[in-house]
Regions:
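Extracytoplasmic beta-strand/coil segments of soluble accessory domains associated
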Residues: 10-49, 53
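Surface-exposed extracellular loop regions of Gram-negative outer-membrane beta-barrel proteins
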Residues: 149-183, 210, 249-258, 262-264, ...
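Predominantly transmembrane beta-strands of Gram-negative outer membrane beta-barrel pores used
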Residues: 41-43, 71-75, 91-97, 103-172, ...
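Gram-negative outer-membrane beta-barrel transporters
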Residues: 116, 447-450, 475-588, 634
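Short acidic/polar hinge/loop motifs at secondary-structure boundaries
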Residues: 15, 49-78
Length: 671
C-alpha cells in the first residue's frame, strides 16, 4: 500500500485477485455490475464495523486512513453469519493496528512516527483531442500523511492525518481533501483483561465528479461541461469495550457515522444536498470449550439511520436489527462452521410513496439466513474447503427514493424495488509449496452464486420526453437510470491465486501475488418482463442488453499479478492488471439516438462515441504499473511510482475514460 503511493485504499483493492472497483462500487467475482455508488453487495468494514453510508449505501473509501493499515481481509461469498445484509457478495475487512513493540522501543519516550509525502503529475494522453488543459503544463497532485503512536503506561495512543490535493485529469474533477484520525485504548488497571477505547476519523473535502463524458474525442470533458462539486464533512466516532474472563470473551463495538454533502453544479446550488446520521452497535459473546474443541459465537447487531435530503424525497429513517449465532468445531483435521442469522429491516418515510395504488409510509420485512462451511487438512500443507451460505439485501434509500440529475442524466426513484436474496457456494483447494528458499501458497476454487430479484442500475426511457418552445427535446428524451429487479441470475466460475516469497541470495528476496478469475454471469430469465418503460413497453434482459449471454457491466476474464524484488537497500516492483471486453451494457447506449442523434427531432448525438470506443477496446485492457524505491538510511526512503506505464487508453465502463499515465515521487520517514 505504501510503496504504491496509495492515496485511496480502493485503488489498492484493485490488485486483489477476484476484486474489482467501479465508481467506488466493490465487486467480488462478478457479483455486482455498476450502480453509481447506490447500494453495495460487498460489506466493507474497518476493524469489524461497516463503513457504509446509511442513506445511499455507499462505501466511504476516502474516510479510511491509508497511513494506518495493518492488513486487508477478503471473504468471498456469503460464508459467515457474523456479517449482515450487505455481505451478499462478500466482505472486505480493513484492520488498523498499533505499531510493533520493536518500533515503539526505538524511542520509548517519543513513540513511533511515520511521515509520507508525495508529489506527482499527470502525463499528456496519447490523443491530443483529450487534452483540455494547457498543453505546456501538466496537471499535478500532491499529498502528505503522518502517523504517530505512543505508549503511555497502560494507554495506547495514535494520531494521524492526511492532506491531499489533485488537479485531476478530467475537467472540473478537482479534489481538496483533509483527513484526521485518532485512537485511544486503555487496559484497565483494576480489572484484568478489560480493555476499552475510542477511535475516530474526520474527513473534510471538496470533490468534483461527473457521470459520463462529452464525447469519445473529448473523453476527459464531462457531458455539457457539467460537474457536480461536493463539499462535505464525514466523520465517525467508535467507542468500544472488550472483556475476557476465562473462556468467555465479550465485545461491544459502537459507531456513530455522520455525513454532510453540499452539492453544486457550475457554481449553482442543486438542492441535492444530503445529510445522514448512522448509529451502530454490535455486541458479541464468544465461549470456548477447549476440551471438545468447540467455539460458540453469538451476538446482536443494531443499526439506525436518519437521513434528510430532497433527492431522497424528504426525511427518511431506517432500522436494521439482527441476531446471529455460529459454532466452530474441530474434529481432528476437520473444521466445521455453521450458523444462522435473523435480519429485520424497517424504513419510514415522511412523504408517502405510491405502490400499487396505495400510499405507503412504512416498509418492513424480516428474513433468516443460514450459512456453513468445512475445511479439511488432507496432508501437510494441503487443505480442501467448501462453504454454502444464504444472502439477503434490503434496498438502500438511494435505490428506492433518489430523484436527481447528474450531467443532464436523470436518476429515477423506484419505491416498488424488492429486496434481493440468494445463496453462494464454493469448493476450493489450498496447497503450500516449498522449493529451496521459495515458499508459496496456491489456491484454486470453483464458485457459484444465485440471486432472486437481483437489483441492477438500468439505463432506459423512464421519463416523459419534454420539448422547448422551438420543438427541440430538452430533457434527454426522458432517458436516465433507475434501480430495478431483473429476476433470477447466476454467476459461476473458477479462480486461481498464488502468493509467495523467497530468497534469491542473502541480500535479495522476492514477493509476489497474482490470480486469474473466470466468471460466467448470466440471467436465468432472459425473456421475462421485469419492468416497463415510460410508454409501457415491456423490458426484458434480452431486449435491454447489448449481449444477453452475460450480465451487464461485467467481465468474464480478469487476471492480476504484482511482483516486488528487494536487494539490499533497493526495491523494484510491478503490477499488471488485465480484463477482457465488457460485452454487455444497456442496449440503449449502443443505439443511433445515443451515438448519432435524431435529425427528425433536431437532436445531436446524446453521448457521442460509445460505439466507437467499444470497437477500439474490444480486446480488453492490459495496464502496467511500476515502482522503485531506495532506503537512504535507517529512517528515510525515497520512491518513484509510474501508473499506467504505457499510457494506455481504457474505460471502467461506457463513457468513463480512465486516467492517463501518472508519475509520483515519494519521501517516506519512519522515526
Amino acid at each position: 500500500i505504501e510503496n504504491k503511493n496509495t492515496t485511496e485504499i480502493q485503488t489498492a483493492m484493485e490488485q486483489i485477485p477476484g476484486v474489482n472497483i467501479t465508481d467506488g462500487q466493490a465487486n467480488i467475482r462478478g457479483g455486482s455490475g455498476w450502480s453509481y455508488g447506490a447500494g453495495s453487495r460487498v460489506l466493507v468494514m474497518v476493524d469489524d464495523m461497516p463503513l457504509i453510508s446509511g442513506d445511499a449505501g455507499q462505501v466511504q473509501w476516502k474516510l479510511i486512513a491509508t497511513e494506518n493499515i495493518n492488513q486487508v481481509e477478503v471473504i468471498k461469498g456469503a460464508s459467515s453469519v457474523l456479517y449482515g445484509s450487505s455481505a451478499l457478495n462478500g466482505v472486505i475487512n480493513i484492520r488498523t493496528a498499533f505499531p510493533s513493540k520493536k518500533d515503539i522501543d526505538k524511542h520509548p519516550s517519543l513513540g513511533y512516527t511515520k511521515i509520507n509525502t508525495h508529489y506527482g503529475f499527470i502525463d499528456f494522453p496519447q490523443r491530443s483531442s483529450l487534452i483540455w488543459w494547457n498543453q505546456y503544463k501538466r496537471r499535478v497532485y500532491k499529498g502528505l500523511e503522518f502517523f504517530h503512536a505512543q505508549k503511555l503506561d497502560n494507554i495506547n495512543l495514535t494520531i494521524g492525518g492526511n492532506v491531499f490535493k489533485d488537479q485531476g485529469y478530467r475537467k472540473g474533477e478537482v479534489t481538496d481533501r483533509k483527513r484526521f484520525n485518532f485512537s485511544l485504548e486503555k487496559q484497565d488497571e483494576k480489572i484484568k483483561n478489560l480493555i476499552y477505547g475510542i477511535k475516530g476519523n474526520f474527513l473534510f473535502q471538496s470533490t468534483g465528479s461527473a457521470l459520463i463524458w462529452d464525447s469519445y474525442e473529448n473523453g476527459y470533458i464531462p457531458l455539457d461541461d457539467k460537474i457536480t462539486t461536493t463539499s462535505g464533512d464525514v466523520f465517525n466516532v467508535d467507542p468500544y469495550v472488550k472483556y475476557t474472563i476465562g473462556n468467555n470473551r465479550h465485545s461491544l463495538n459502537t459507531r456513530y457515522l455522520h455525513l454532510i454533502n453540499d452539492n453544486e453544479t457550475k457554481g449553482s446550488e442543486t438542492n441535492d444536498d444530503n445529510r445522514s446520521r448512522l448509529f451502530y452497535t454490535d455486541y458479541q459473546w464468544q465461549k470456548r470449550f477447549e476440551k471438545i474443541n468447540l467455539l460458540i459465537t453469538t451476538g446482536t447487531t443494531n443499526e439506525i439511520v436518519y437521513a434528510q435530503s430532497k433527492i431522497f424525497q424528504g426525511k427518511n429513517s431506517r432500522s436494521n436489527h439482527s441476531l446471529y449465532s455460529q459454532i466452530d468445531k474441530k474434529l481432528g483435521k476437520l473444521n466445521i462452521s455453521a450458523g444462522a442469522r435473523y435480519e429485520y429491516f424497517s424504513l419510514d418515510s415522511e412523504d408517502g410513496h405510491e405502490i400499487n395504488g396505495d400510499t405507503i409510509y412504512h416498509f418492513a420485512e424480516a428474513k433468516p439466513v443460514f450459512r456453513g462451511g468445512l475445511n479439511y487438512q488432507i496432508a501437510e500443507g494441503t487443505f480442501i474447503r467448501s462453504s454454502w451460505g444464504q444472502g439477503y439485501r434490503f434496498p438502500s434509500m438511494a435505490e428506492l427514493f433518489v430523484t436527481t440529475n447528474v450531467s443532464d442524466i436523470e436518476i429515477f426513484p423506484n419505491p416498488e424495488l424488492r429486496s434481493e436474496k440468494g445463496w453462494s457456494s464454493e469448493i476450493g483447494l489450498k496447497q503450500a509449496v516449498q522449493f529451496g528458499r521459495f515458499r508459496s501458497f496456491i489456491d484454486i476454487a470453483a464458485f457459484i452464486m444465485r440471486y432472486d430479484d437481483m437489483m441492477e442500475f438500468t439505463f432506459g426511457q423512464w421519463g416523459e420526453p419534454e420539448f422547448d418552445e422551438n420543438g427541440n427535446v430538452s430533457n434527454f428524451f426522458g432517458l436516465g437510470f433507475k434501480s430495478v429487479n431483473v429476476g433470477k441470475t447466476e454467476i459461476s466460475g473458477i479462480e486461481l491465486s498464488i502468493t509467495g516469497e523467497g530468497k534469491i541470495n542473502e541480500i535479495t528476496k522476492i514477493n509476489f501475488i497474482g490470480g486469474y478469475t473466470y466468471m460466467n454471469p448470466i440471467s436465468l430469465e432472459l425473456n421475462k418482463s421485469y419492468a416497463n418503460d415510460y410508454y409501457g413497453n415491456p423490458i426484458t434482459y434480452n431486449n435491454s442488453s447489448s449481449d444477453s449471454t452475460i450480465l451487464k457491466y461485467r467481465y468474464r476474464n480478469v487476471a492480476k499479478i504484482d511482483i516486488e524484488l528487494l536487494r539490499d537497500k533497493f526495491s523494484i516492483g510491478s503490477s499488471v492488471r488485465y480484463n477482457d471486453f465488457m460485452s454487455n451494457i444497456d442496449y440503449i447506449f449502443t443505439t443511433d439516438l445515443i451515438n448519432n442523434g435524431d435529425p427528425n427531432f433536431g437532436v445531436d448525438a446524446l453521448i457521442p462515441g460509445i460505439n466507437e470506443s467499444r470497437e477500439k477496446f474490444k480486446d480488453g485492457d492490459l495496464v502496467f504499473d511500476i515502482r522503485v524505491g531506495y532506503q537512504l538510511d535507517e529512517i528515510s526512503k525515497i520512491g518513484f511510482v509510474v501508473n499506467n506505464l504505457f499510457n494506455r487508453e481504457y474505460m471502467s465502463r461506457p463513457a468513463n475514460m480512465m486516467p492517463p499515465r501518472t508519475f509520483a515521487f515519494q519521501l517516506n520517514l519512519k522515526i
